[in-house]
Structures are given as structure tokens and as C-alpha cells.
């Protein structure tokens, strides 16, 4: 090899201590292309030593060979001069005037089909299509060059260099390989046609290639950390926690079916979390929940309750948790979580299911789920689009060989019908434990056709724990204010508190639930399937059956007493009907509830109630059903690269991030510091996380209704907008109404 070929440019930077003096850090030794290639191959081989049982020999070979050749294109002279500017004079090359062809595109046309087939006797033409597509698209680049441009570029800047690098003469590029690509990242036409097996093989090769490449580029040797398959440390911790207790039926079932995909329906308080963790059996697992607050609670339970230190959490606010745990290791912990490197990851579905949109860069999630177990908690809590995303994603995971467990207190029969329709039901076991005789009857329902009885609620709150759930934030604020006039022990929790204060309130309501304290908490839907709380009495606005049963689960949760009088009061005041909840489902939920009024409402009856409301034939013409069906059909027609990584959103949440002016004024120096261009990326991330803690998300539709109270322009380089609306919160008593839309402070900062 006549010339040294490099994989990346030299790294330079400023340390925090040196920033003021602007003294450059010592340069890291530049890694050669050959060493980078060997590191990635070694990373792949080490991975297969631990996780090889999940893959066929052909799959392993495809991935390793993709790791070996994917960066060959970096040997091209233009790339080498760009990362080593001193070569420009030596080779008399002005790279600024040359349009560089992406190195992945060059790598994909360096290897001939015959060379590929010679690698392994089992390789086929379909394998070549998946393989060459993974190499070609291993970075997200537009297809802007045709075969003639590739050949011309190759003759000028690549063939001599790749021959030198490989130590074997290369006289041409195999541009016919482009005809084997499964798709192009440019304008496309017609329906995307690809055999699912070939597409899934592409997902596997591309996903693992990216995983190993990202791992090595981040400075790690191993793609997976603390593999628990042999030692089963988490399983032992859970068994230790359950020691001396008989396993509940759901727990026994999941322990006996560790190798199967499952749908387990079991009431609140039946030990579903422990059942799911036992089902993992030491294998790599992802535990998903609908909300970040519930993800945080499960993460804390696994990490602190069971003492399992290798669990991580991954969502848009996870960095804040790591900073609270240990600021010194927060950056590394977050990076490892993003690399999907830990044995147990607690997350929301938003991180995992983007691969359904076939966006470049999302293949790593499908590939990782092939050798993992996926837990989906409370699937009925998702909106129709998210449910469709989950079901379509599970179909892909099932085809690739992954396993999943849906664990839920309520499972609408329409979801089982969709699973049957799309071939999921044939490959998983269903088990319903709502008839478990050991589950006590916990609820008696009273329906009120009026607004809430505030005097009665205030009176109950003097001696009992009372939970009030409203369908909208504005109604919750209104009810809270009126109750505060009647009782001092009233708190409010909803989404219009800044994250810092909302975290305090979530901690407070958990502590309140466990204490002997009496009082009232007014909340919104955010407590439905998120917080492990237990109140004596529930007053709730009417909603759809799935949400209503979730809300009931926050009352008499542990079944300490069988109610003689009603402990669930449901108010049919129509707040949210037609806007928050589909009117048809709202009315069906109300009508079917009436026959269960003023009787002991058993878990078996709740399942019957849910089945009556969500019977497929009865709701086939509802928007709920049509949206799931339409989304499932749409996913099957999506063309690869039709969506970008930023566009591949599991949940269609359109919101902006705001900070109340009073909070902004107290923290203005953080906004100034984050603009400092000499900050290290770690410090910048830390500041951005602190800033996020001082903000809240506001739905865009809500913003449109209040156009004069929120700045249109964001602050500096952040995506945070100032709002002049009053923000009310007492950090000592943890009381206040939060952000009051439409109510401006007397003094407005401009």
C-alpha cells in the first residue's frame, strides 16, 4: 500500500478549562481506514459470539461482509484530501471544485456479483440486492449521479486508490449493481414492490451495519453491554422480590411461555410488570409505555426497586434523569442508550417504531428488535395511528424472528380482530386473567348527569384521598380553583406545568398516595396509565371505556376494601365529547356503562363492558376503526426514503415548546451561555437539558387560539418560545394553576 488511507478527519476541540484561553486540545491520532474497518468487523464478530443464536449463518456472514466493504469508497482521492488537506498540494487537487460522490455509493459498485457469490455458497441474487442496498445507503445521501458519472469519477479519483488500498488491481466499477438496488433515495414513481423476506434482510444488514459502525465511531469496542443471557441478573432480582409469595396466574403464565409472543390481559394490581420482566428471561429487552412519566416510573422501579443497574431509559427527556442520577456519567449513559446497547431499555414507542415509515436511518431499530424481546404495556391507551404503527411494526418484528408481549388491563376486541386480519394472532398466545378469583372487587359506579358536585368533593377530601379527573386542562384549572375555596388540601396536575414543576408534582402525588394524608388531587388524562397511585374515591368526567377503566384503576387499586357505597362517580357533562373523544365511542361507552351502575363492578364485568363497547361490528364505521385500517394500508404502501428521519413520527403531535416569561427572566444566563460557540458538546447538551426542564409543550391548535400571548420567534438557536401568559406555581406548597392561557401578567417582558 503506497499511501495511508484514513477513515475520518482529525478531531480537534477545546476543553472547558481551556475555552477562555482558546488553547487547542492535543490532536487525537487519526484512525486509518484499515484499522476502522478491522474494528467494525471485530465488533460484529464479538457481537455474534454473544447473540449468534438469533441469526442464521448466512445472516451473520452478510453482516460481517457488509462491515468489511462498506467504507471502501472512502479510499477515493477527493475524500482523502478533504480529511487530510495537506494532501491537496502534494496531489495538486482542488477539491472545492469537485462534486464528491458519496463513499457508500462507490463501495456498492466496487464489488462484483461474482465476487459476492464467491464469499459464501449460500448467497443468492436476492441476498445481493439486500446487501448492496445496505452498503449503498449506509449513510443517508441523495442519488444524484448516474452510471456514467460514477465511471468518470472512478477513473479520475478512485480506481487507482482502491487498487492500492486493497492490494489488488481494480480496473472498473460495476455500475450494473445499481440495477439490483431495492430503492433509490430520489424521486420515485409507482408502487414499491419488494418481497418482505428480502426487505427484512435489508433491514437486518443495514441496521446491524449502522449499529456496529456507530459503536466503533463512538469509541466503544462492543455493541452490547452487560449481556444478561447467561447470568439472568434481572430475573434473579425479580424472583428475590417475589420470594415467599406464590406467583400470580399472569406471572406463572408468562414464566412458562418465555419463548412465545404473548397478549396478556390482567387487571391492575395483578403483577403484570413482574410477569413481563420474568418473561424476558435475561434476554435483551425493551419495555415500552405510552407516556414518559410512566416510563420514568418503570425505569426507577427496575433500577432502584430491583437494584438492576444496567437498565437505561430512552426518550426526549431522559438526559434530565441521567443528570440527576450522576452528572459525571450522564453524557455517556445517554449515548449508550441511543446506541441501544443495554440489556434493558425502558422507552416510549416513539423511539423504536420509526422503521415502519421506511426512513433511512431507522433500520437499526428493526434489526435490534430481531434479537430482543419487546414489552408493550397498555396498548389501548394509544391513539388509532399509534396502534396501527405498533401492529404493523409487530408484523415486521415477527417476520424477522423477534418476540413481543402485549400486557394490558383492557384489550379491545377490535385490536384482536386487526391482529387476526394481519396475521399476528396466528403467531402469539392470548391469555385473559380478568376472571382470577383472587382479584377483589374494587369498584361501585354512580353516574351523574351534571357538573361535578364540588361541595361533596370538598367534604370528602377532609377525611379521604379524592382523585378528580377532567378531560381538559382548562376544566381542571377551573375545578381546582373552586375546590381551593372550599378546602386547602387541594393540588393540581396537568400538562401545562414546566417539566421541573411537573416532576415535583408527580413525586408529590406518589408520596401522597402512599401516606395517611387526606386531600384532593385534580388531574387530567396524564394519570390514566402512568402513575402507580391509589385513592379512596374517584370523580371523573365521562370518557371512552378504555380511558374510564384506566381511571378506575387509580381508585382502590390494591383492593383493600370491597365498596359498600359508590367510590367511582362519573359525570356525563359532555366536556370533551366530539373534541377529545369521538362522540360515537363516548356515547356507546356511556350507554353500555348504565347496566353496571350501583352494583359491584367486577374485573370480569369490566372486560365484558369493554368488549361490548369495542365490538368490531358495532364500531366498524367509527373514525377510530377507519383510522387504524387506513394507517395499516398506508404503511404497506410507503416507499423507502419517502419519509426522512425527522419526518418519521410515530405520534402526530404538533406542538411548540414554551417558557413563561417569569421563568425566562430567572434563567436568562443559561440562554446566553448555550449560544457560546466554544462550549463543549457535553456542556451544551447539559444546558439544553436544563432549559428543557424549564419549558412545557403547547399543542399548536391551542396556540392558534391564543396568537398574542406566545412569541412567534424562538429564543436564539433554541426551539423555545417565550410566553407572556401568567404562570402560577408555589415551589414550597406545590400548589398553583400552572400556565393560564389568555391571562397575561400585568408587566410584560418584551
Language-model regions: role of each:
Residues 2-29, 33-230:
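Accessory nucleic-acid engagement/destabilization modules that flank
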Residues 364-373, 379-434:
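Post-DEXD/H (motif II) to motif III coupling segment of the RecA-like Helicase ATP-binding lobe
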Residues 309-355:
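Inter-Walker segment of RecA-like/P-loop motor cores
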Residues 284-295, 461-484, 492:
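Conserved strand-helix element at the start of the C-terminal RecA-like helicase core
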Residues 2-9, 13, 549-552, 558-750:
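C-terminal accessory region of SF2 helicases/translocases
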Residues 97-102, 496-499, 503, 517-565, ...:
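Conserved RecA-like helicase motor core of SF1/SF2 enzymes
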Residues 282-306, 315-318, 413-415:
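Conserved Walker A/P-loop ATP-binding site and its immediately adjacent core
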Residues 413-461:
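Interdomain hinge/linker at the junction between the two RecA-like core domains of SF2 helicases
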Amino acid at each position: 500500500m503506497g499511501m495511508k488511507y484514513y477513515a475520518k478527519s482529525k478531531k480537534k476541540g477545546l476543553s472547558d478549562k481551556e475555552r477562555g484561553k482558546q488553547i487547542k486540545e492535543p490532536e487525537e491520532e487519526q484512525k486509518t481506514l484499515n484499522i476502522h474497518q478491522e474494528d467494525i468487523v471485530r465488533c460484529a464478530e464479538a457481537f455474534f459470539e454473544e447473540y449468534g443464536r438469533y441469526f442464521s449463518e448466512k445472516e451473520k456472514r452478510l453482516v460481517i461482509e457488509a462491515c468489511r466493504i462498506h467504507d471502501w469508497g472512502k479510499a477515493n482521492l477527493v475524500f482523502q484530501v478533504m480529511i487530510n488537506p495537506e494532501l491537496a498540494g502534494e496531489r495538486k487537487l482542488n477539491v472545492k471544485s469537485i462534486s464528491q460522490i458519496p463513499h457508500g455509493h462507490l463501495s456498492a459498485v466496487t464489488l462484483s456479483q461474482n465476487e459476492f457469490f464467491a464469499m459464501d455458497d449460500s448467497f443468492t441474487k436476492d441476498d445481493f440486492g439486500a446487501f448492496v442496498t445496505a452498503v449503498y445507503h449506509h449513510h443517508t445521501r441523495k442519488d444524484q449521479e448516474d452510471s456514467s458519472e460514477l465511471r468518470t469519477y472512478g477513473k479520475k479519483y478512485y480506481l487507482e486508490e482502491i487498487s492500492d488500498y486493497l492490494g489488488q488491481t481494480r480496473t472498473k466499477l460495476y455500475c450494473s449493481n445499481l440495477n439490483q438496488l431495492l430503492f433509490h433515495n430520489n424521486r420515485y414513481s409507482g408502487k414499491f414492490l419488494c418481497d418482505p423476506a428480502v426487505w427484512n434482510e435489508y433491514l437486518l444488514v443495514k441496521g446491524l451495519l449502522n449499529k456496529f459502525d456507530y459503536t466503533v465511531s463512538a469509541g466503544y469496542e462492543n455493541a452490547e453491554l452487560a449481556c444478561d443471557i447467561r447470568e439472568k441478573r434481572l430475573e434473579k432480582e425479580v424472583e428475590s422480590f417475589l420470594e415467599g409469595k406464590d406467583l400470580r396466574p399472569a406471572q406463572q403464565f408468562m414464566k412458562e411461555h418465555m419463548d412465545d409472543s404473548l397478549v396478556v390481559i390482567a387487571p391492575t394490581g395483578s403483577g403484570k410488570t413482574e410477569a413481563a420482566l420474568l418473561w424476558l428471561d435475561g434476554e435483551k429487552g425493551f419495555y415500552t409505555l405510552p407516556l414518559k412519566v410512566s416510563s420514568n416510573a418503570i425505569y426507577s422501579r427496575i433500577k432502584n426497586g430491583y437494584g438492576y443497574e444496567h437498565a437505561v431509559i430512552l426518550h426526549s427527556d431522559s438526559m434530565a434523569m441521567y443528570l440527576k442520577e450522576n452528572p459525571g456519567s450522564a453524557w455517556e449513559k445517554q449515548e449508550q442508550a441511543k446506541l441501544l446497547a443495554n440489556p434493558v431499555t425502558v422507552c416510549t414507542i416513539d423511539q423504536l417504531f420509526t422503521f415502519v415509515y421506511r426512513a433511512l436511518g431507522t433500520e437499526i431499530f428493526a434489526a435490534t428488535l430481531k434479537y430482543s424481546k419487546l414489552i408493550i404495556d397498555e396498548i389501548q391507551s394509544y391513539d388509532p395511528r399509534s396502534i396501527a404503527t405498533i401492529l404493523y411494526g409487530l408484523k415486521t418484528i415477527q417476520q424477522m424472528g423477534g418476540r413481543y408481549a402485549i400486557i394490558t388491563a383492557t384489550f379491545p376486541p377490535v385490536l384482536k380482530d386487526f391482529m387476526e386480519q394481519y396475521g399476528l394472532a396466528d403467531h402469539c398466545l392470548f391469555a385473559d386473567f380478568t376472571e382470577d378469583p383472587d382479584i377483589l372487587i374494587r369498584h361501585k359506579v354512580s353516574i351523574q348527569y351534571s357538573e361535578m358536585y364540588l361541595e361533596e368533593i370538598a367534604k370528602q377530601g377532609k377525611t379521604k384521598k379524592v382523585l378528580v379527573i377532567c378531560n381538559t386542562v382548562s376544566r381542571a384549572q377551573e375545578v381546582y380553583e373552586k375546590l381551593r375555596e372550599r378546602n386547602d388540601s387541594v393540588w393540581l396536575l396537568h400538562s401545562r406545568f414546566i417539566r421541573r414543576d411537573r416532576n415535583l408534582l408527580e413525586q408529590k402525588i406518589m408520596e401522597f398516595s402512599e401516606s395517611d394524608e387526606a386531600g384532593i388531587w385534580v388531574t387530567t388524562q396524564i394519570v390514566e396509565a402512568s402513575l402507580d397511585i391509589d385513592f379512596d374515591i374517584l370523580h371523573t368526567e365521562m370518557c371512552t371505556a378504555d380511558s374510564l377503566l384506566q381511571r378506575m384503576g387509580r381508585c382502590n387499586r390494591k383492593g383493600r376494601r370491597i365498596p359498600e357505597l359508590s367510590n367511582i362517580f362519573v359525570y356525563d357533562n359532555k366536556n370533551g365529547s366530539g373534541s377529545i373523544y369521538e362522540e360515537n365511542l363516548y356515547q356507546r361507552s356511556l350507554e353500555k356503562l348504565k347496566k353496571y351502575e350501583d352494583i359491584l363492578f367486577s374485573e370480569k364485568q369490566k372486560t365484558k363492558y369493554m368488549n361490548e363497547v369495542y365490538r368490531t361490528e358495532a364500531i366498524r364505521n367509527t373514525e377510530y376503526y377507519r383510522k387504524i385500517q387506513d394507517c395499516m394500508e398506508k404503511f404497506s404502501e410507503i416507499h423507502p426514503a419517502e419519509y426522512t428521519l425527522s419526518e418519521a413520527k410515530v405520534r402526530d403531535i404538533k406542538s411548540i415548546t414554551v417558557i413563561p416569561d417569569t421563568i425566562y427572566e430567572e434563567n436568562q444566563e443559561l440562554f446566553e451561555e448555550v449560544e457560546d460557540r466554544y462550549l463543549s458538546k457535553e456542556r451544551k447538551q447539559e444546558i439544553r437539558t436544563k432549559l428543557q426542564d424549564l419549558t412545557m409543550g403547547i399543542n399548536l391548535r391551542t396556540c392558534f387560539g391564543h396568537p398574542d400571548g406566545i412569541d412567534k420567534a424562538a429564543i436564539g438557536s433554541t426551539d423555545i418560545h417565550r410566553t407572556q401568559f401568567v404562570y402560577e406555581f408555589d415551589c414550597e406548597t406545590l400548589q398553583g394553576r400552572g400556565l393560564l392561557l389568555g391571562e397575561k401578567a400585568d408587566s410584560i417582558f418584551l
